[in-house]
Regions:
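Structured catalytic-domain cores with a bias toward divalent-metal coordination
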Residues: 1-190
């Protein structure tokens, strides 16, 4: 939530990939960041053993610290990204994965693009009906920037610029309640 060295040092203990975000503002780390270095960690789906183990190792490491380092973090130590947009699918659009049914037919392996830097032209799926001619992508300022990130050519939905999706899910309920994913871009730091 902040780019000061102590925050980045704490994030570095959890992962080489660090994401700076300002929305949603209601996360606990935002409140704590007014008092001390605080981060939000992404551990995967609830109950996944790898995520639980990773979080436990991080907490054990933090408990062994006498203090959080405050020296600047170099670009070699972390890959810093900024969340720039949220991809939403309207409730009126029927979604499917790996099939040609529904309005938006997403590739079956979509969740494998999670936290991967992908180039322009990466396929996300196909538009399988006339009900969808534009994917809703909302910037942090509330602007629809879908055309900046995705194109539909011959029914094929693909990225129009390099980007890193995060929190990609194939869970339709989560897509409806929250979003399909967030989009991130690399953030240069010194």
């Amino acid at each position: 939530n902040r780019l000061e060295p102590a925050f980045l040092q704490l994030a570095k203990l959890f992962s080489h990939t660090v994401v700076f975000f300002t929305q949603p503002a209601e996360v606990q780390s935002m409140a704590f960041s007014n008092f001390c270095p605080a981060i939000t960690v992404e551990c995967g789906r609830p109950g996944e053993v790898n995520g639980i183990t990773h979080a436990l190792n991080f907490l054990q490491h933090c408990l062994k610290l006498s203090e959080i380092p405050t020296q600047p973090v170099t670009a070699e130590e972390i890959a810093l990204f900024h969340t720039v947009a949220t991809v939403k699918v309207p409730d009126t659009i029927e979604i499917s994965f790996g099939t040609a049914t529904g309005d938006l037919c997403l590739i079956n392996e979509l969740d494998q693009l999670n936290f991967q830097e992908i180039p322009a032209g990466t396929p996300f799926g196909r538009v399988c009906s006339d009900h969808l001619n534009h994917l809703e992508v909302w910037s942090e300022s509330g602007q629809d920037v879908g055309d900046n990130f995705f194109t539909i050519q011959g029914g094929r939905l693909q990225t129009s610029k390099p980007v890193m999706p995060s929190m990609l899910t194939k869970d339709i309920e989560i897509i409806r309640q929250d979003c399909l994913c967030y989009l991130m871009e690399r953030l240069e730091h010194t």
